[in-house]
């Protein structure tokens, strides 16, 4: 893996998510170099120009330019945001066929550059495409990471914070599983400032589990509501991607709910799925295996099964 004094992120895909991610990187000065790659050269060039014009207002200047796949050779992270977008009424899994073809071409071109860093995948269905990137690239599983349920967990913490009138930073809760319709809340490990959420419910009649069940539905279906209102989701996921990038480049050893490869954890194998993991400069340092309730384990197994059923027709020989 490349170790340089200057951090470089290569962004592939300058659509709504990609450009929002680039904006977040510059505003937080997360990387020293950012190269933008897109099939639409004018869009990528325009983004690079626009971002450079605002660079003096950022905490630190980030060298930003429009480039090509050769620039991936010295990248520490290649973040892929390219692909077909989710349309109203379309699930993330409906996008599989279209995006697998796109990803094969993208990953092949990145690897041909001599890239030896970490892949960060955002394109949906993210768990499927992260697995595909791992297979296409031949990189160690620890160095291929998907955004997974980082945004779902962020939505979860935000809405729980609203419900209990507590800052989201003091809400500790995870959404795990597929980034999609079969994801699940881990109520057994959700707490507010160290006090279990389930205990808060029993202590105070003002709080009801029925409310929290609906709260989770709002988390799960958030993307559909946002897509219906504005056509796409991009700010939240871009900020989540920036958070993962920061954890990698700063060697933070931070616990984030990302899509990572399971090899026996949670009773599952050969699948990329959203779980809490320790993220640092090497990628995934380790997976944190939560002790799930019986119901949660069944739901997680179902989520994993759904993903495997989608993967099987495309990677049957490899599996």
Curated annotation (Swiss-Prot):
Catalytic-site annotation from UniProt: 179
PROSITE patterns hit by this protein: L_LDH
Positions contributing to beta-D-fructose 1,6-bisphosphate binding: 157, 172
Listed InterPro entries: L-lactate/malate_DH, L-lactate_DH, L-lactate_DH_AS, Lactate/malate_DH_C, Lactate/malate_DH_N, Lactate_DH/Glyco_Ohase_4_C, NAD(P)-bd_dom_sf
GO cellular component labels: cytoplasm
GO molecular function, one term: L-lactate dehydrogenase activity
Superkingdom in the source lineage: Bacteria
Cellular location(s): Cytoplasm
Residues at which substrate binds: 86, 92, 124-127, 152-155, 233
Record-listed Phosphotyrosine modification sites: 224
EC number: 1.1.1.27
Gene Ontology BP annotations: glycolytic process; lactate metabolic process
This protein's pathway: Fermentation; pyruvate fermentation to lactate; (S)-lactate from pyruvate: step 1/1
Protein name: L-lactate dehydrogenase 2
Organism listed in the record: Peribacillus psychrosaccharolyticus (Bacillus psychrosaccharolyticus)
Classification of source organism: Bacteria, Bacillati, Bacillota, Bacilli, Bacillales
């Amino acid at each position: 893996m490349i170790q340089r004094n200057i951090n470089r992120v290569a962004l592939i895909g300058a659509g709504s998510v990609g450009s929002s991610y680039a904006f977040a990187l510059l505003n937080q000065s997360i990387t020293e170099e950012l190269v933008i790659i897109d099939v639409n050269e004018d869009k990528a060039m325009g983004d690079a120009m626009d971002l450079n014009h605002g660079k003096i207002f950022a905490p630190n200047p980030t060298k930003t330019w429009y480039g090509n796949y050769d620039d991936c050779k010295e990248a520490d992270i290649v973040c892929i945001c390219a692909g077909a977008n989710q349309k109203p009424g379309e699930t993330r899994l409906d996008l599989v066929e279209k995006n697998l073809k796109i990803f094969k071409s993208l990953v092949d071109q990145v690897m041909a550059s001599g890239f030896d860093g970490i892949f960060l995948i955002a394109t949906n269905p993210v768990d499927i495409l992260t697995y595909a990137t791992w297979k296409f690239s031949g990189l160690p599983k620890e160095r291929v990471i998907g955004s997974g349920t980082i945004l779902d967990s962020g939505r979860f913490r935000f809405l729980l914070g609203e419900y209990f009138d507590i800052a989201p930073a003091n809400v500790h809760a995870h959404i795990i599983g597929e980034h999609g319709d079969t994801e699940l809340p881990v109520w057994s490990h959700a707490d507010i400032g160290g006090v279990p959420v389930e205990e808060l419910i029993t202590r105070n009649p003002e709080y009801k589990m029925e409310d929290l069940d609906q709260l989770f539905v709002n988390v799960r279906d958030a993307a559909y509501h946002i897509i219906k209102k504005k056509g796409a989701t991009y700010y939240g996921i871009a900020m989540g991607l920036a958070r993962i990038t920061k954890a990698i480049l700063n060697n933070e050893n931070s616990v984030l709910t990302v899509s990572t490869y399971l090899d026996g954890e949670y009773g599952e194998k050969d699948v990329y799925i959203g779980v809490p993991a320790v993220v640092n400069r090497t990628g995934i340092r380790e997976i944190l295996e939560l002790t799930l309730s019986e119901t949660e384990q069944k739901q997680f197994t179902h989520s994993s099964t759904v993903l495997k059923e989608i993967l099987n027709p495309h990677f049957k020989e490899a599996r």
